[in-house]
Amino acid sequence: MNSELRKIRWGVLGYARIARVELIPAIRRAANAEFHALASRDEGKLAEARAQFPGLARTYRGYEELLRDPEVDAVYVPLPNALHCAWTIRAAEHGKHVLVEKPAGLNAAECRAMIDACRAHGVRLMEAFMYRYTARTRAVLEVIRSGVLGEIKQVHATFRFLLANPASIKLRPELGGGALYDVGCYPVNFVGLVVDAMAGGEPGAGGQPESVAVECVRAGGIDTNFSALLKYPSGLLAAVHCGFNAHKRVAAELTGTLGVLEIPDTFFDPAGALTLTIGEERREIPVAASDRYRHEVEDFSDAILQRRAPQFSLAETLRNAEVMDRLLAASR
């Protein structure tokens, strides 16, 4: 690919809801990207996409056909979790850069295989944790790095919602369903972000928990309610919660020796505020709305154009998978 290209031409493998509602519109808003091609095995979905996104250059009935398109520079993979590894590797073999939806793989072994394949073929790979591109996340990091909380001793992070669709692929174990894979990966990643910031900010610097404990409720072969406690060598205790079987809650809290930071809508990007309590003083830290998916697309596209690493690192992807492996093993 010519590094002087002003825009990265994107292909999308599958017309999943997140692609239709979030990523494809974000690609179209991005300054350095264009939505070039879509592959779906459903002709009805392709017709819908052509109507919804005028100017879509090419549509394909097979994923392999799209990967053979020489004009596609990068692909987004929003397929069911169990298909991420195989199609990421196939994309790399065709010389395509890959933004893969979280979780990148079902386990650390799959993630290593994906990373190795992308490195072997000289293409970029990034896991799509869009919350890392919000003003809210930047504000959290600024508070941690300021030291105003003192030494952080506890982290609580929750991402849950009530899943009302009994036919959802999120409930199918053979496709990589389950609450931990679907939404629990966010709190796990958030804890990693916090411990890295505490350790100086380098990806992976915060290391692994020294022990984990899990309680889990299962139904239909998947976890539907999942809570874990992670203990780190520093003495930090992190509690992560996720589930499909209760009212929506997305929040986090950091407790240090000097204060507490409350983070509503932790993984979303509306305008709002964090609440910082230091001693008896309580104040709000306003955060602006963020176009998180567009920023994610622009960062990855720029990383390709400038031949640099994207903001979200493969070291973090691998660590997240390793921690989730431990949590899943402890839940069985």
Task: Please place each PLM-identified region on the residue numbering.
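C-terminal helix-rich "cap/oligomerization" subdomain common to oxidoreductases
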Residues: 1-4, 74-76, 233, 285, ...
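N-terminal Rossmann-like dinucleotide-binding module
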Residues: 1-54
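Contiguous beta-strand/loop segments that form the cofactor/metal-binding neighborhood of enzyme cores
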Residues: 4, 189-269, 287, 298-308
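Active-site loop of classical SDR/Rossmann-like NAD(P)-dependent oxidoreductases
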Residues: 18, 287-298
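Conserved SAM-binding strand-loop segment of SAM-dependent methyltransferases
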Residues: 56-62
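Beta-strand-loop-alpha-helix segment that lines the small-molecule cofactor/substrate pocket
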Residues: 74, 80-132, 147
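Predominantly a Rossmann-like dinucleotide-binding segment in NAD(P)-dependent oxidoreductases
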Residues: 131-212
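Short polybasic amphipathic segments
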Residues: 252, 270-279
